[in-house]
Amino acid sequence: MDTLAGILQVASVVLVLVLVHRPLGDLMARMYESRHDTRVERGIYRLIGVDPRSEQTWPAYLRAVLAFSLVGVLVVYGMQRLQAFLPYALGLPAVPEGISFNTAVSFVTNTNWQSYSPEATMGYTVQLAGLAVQNFVSAAVGIAVAIALVRGFARTRSGTIGNMWVDLIRGSLRLLLPLSLVTAVVLIAGGVIQNFAGFQDVQTLAGGTQTIPGGPVASQEAIKMLGTNGGGFFNANSAHPFEDPTAWTSAFQVLLMLVIPFSLPRTFGKMVGDTRQGTAIAAVMATIAVASLTALTLFELQGAGSAPMAAGAAMEGKEQRVGIIGSALFGTVSTLTSTGAVNSMHDSYTALGGMMPMLNMMLGEVAPGGVGSGLYGMLVLAVIAVFVAGLLVGRTPEYLGKKIGPREIKLASLYILVTPILVLVGTALSFAIPAVRDDVEGTSILNSGLHGLSEVVYAFTSAANNNGSAFAGLTASTPWFTTALGVAMLLGRFVPIVLVLALAGSLAAQDRIPTTSGTLPTHRPQFVGLLIGVTVIVTALTYFPVLALGPLAEGLAS
């Protein structure tokens, strides 16, 4: 794909986003504020014994999230261990214990990290009834938590932040399921396969034999992208022609990753009664995304070495049908959201090019972030930003009429610290414990030296931020990585959720402070610039030393 075609691809995605984010954002606001339940929803409420008109305090909301997620982990783990007895197992045996644990945690936490080859490990029943179901509900949980935080800003003197079961079911049935159905049909029209055929041996033109996999790919591909999940039906993920056959399906999948996260700021603005606030948040997200895409594209177009110079760009690990700009667009969006899907191999990027997906995740995946998690992550950073602004002018910080006191700033600060601790401690332990270090260096790391460090840092960054992409040169199916990354995924998902829901409860209980001449206007360009600065300084600089030891040093040495 040439440069002009790549630019047109980016422009088309931006244009469609501009057109759809407003109606979709308004739709989600009405959906989560509605007091009307459909007949199907009422039947589900009766089945699980939930009163949809009864709201929950933040601890009750949290308990529901944790209980539901725990059941999800147990069900997905059990299905993998019993796979040999399930229909459509394709003759595949039970999944080993370590990988079963890692995979169950991965899909329940919306990470979709895959330390296995899907087409050679998972039968169709596990794929559809286990993993695909979690693609829906894990995304719905993320949106529900974001909506709970928005209610915290919107409500006054309230002890409740909504009903988790209502938010979960509405997000699944009214939003994700209909969109996925339409999306799957479009993907099938674009050439993505959808069947229940097993492996087929065919004769190639060269006279040999090749095994061709089948499967219900389009139905899973739709929610994989819409829910910013990212787990592929095939090991090559969206680089596989059965998942992403053409340049336009690649652009369409980029749009799917962005459409809900970029519409949620509009939902936020509608629910707090000031759409300008949502526009400001979306502007921050868009600015960071454009800067990241530009940097990655330039690094890959100007790759050093004789092969990139001969090809005109760094084409290693990239599909010709997608090209440099299409690969950079997909990789940027996949790591700025929590998707983690790939249509090119991030481990094959140039040193500085490979740093960009890593840095995108280190920013906290807030531009626009995953479905739900991106919005609540950016709102936490907004709390930090107004606190910094308050310190600069000597006023009590407030955001949307809510006072940002000691409790709120402690919760926001702890939120910021969670993922850096998981990433840096996990990486350090991988090299500090002698037995683990020997296994990591001898078994897991494909590339020694600076790039080997980058592979491990990338793995923990991806797991702790619930992204799921990888520097695939790292063998992550060892006992250390399946366990350590599983723990990182759990803590990286649920500790921030605890803090966000506690923040939502604290804000909802407050009265609203009247706006005065000294109130910081949080819908103007000055605040947009401040929030961008806080996002970059508070999060990215935390990782500067480890980036200097890995991709930066590798880039300078190349």
UniProtKB/Swiss-Prot annotation:
Residues annotated as transmembrane: 1-21, 58-78, 85-105, 130-150, 179-199, 245-265, 279-299, 374-394, 416-436, 484-504, 527-547
Membrane topology: Multi-pass membrane protein
GO MF annotations in UniProt: P-type potassium transmembrane transporter activity; potassium ion binding
Keywords tagged on the record: Cell membrane, Ion transport, Membrane, Potassium, Potassium transport, Transmembrane, Transmembrane helix, Transport
Pfam families reported in the protein's UniProt record: KdpA
GO CC terms of this entry: plasma membrane
Subcellular location, record wording: Cell membrane
The protein's role, per its UniProt record: Part of the high-affinity ATP-driven potassium transport (or Kdp) system, which catalyzes the hydrolysis of ATP coupled with the electrogenic transport of potassium into the cytoplasm. This subunit binds the extracellular potassium ions and delivers the ions to the membrane domain of KdpB through an intramembrane tunnel.
Assembly and binders: The system is composed of three essential subunits: KdpA, KdpB and KdpC.
Entry similarity comment: Belongs to the KdpA family.
Name under which the protein is recorded: Potassium-transporting ATPase potassium-binding subunit
Species the sequence originates in: Clavibacter sepedonicus (Clavibacter michiganensis subsp. sepedonicus)
Name of the encoding gene: kdpA
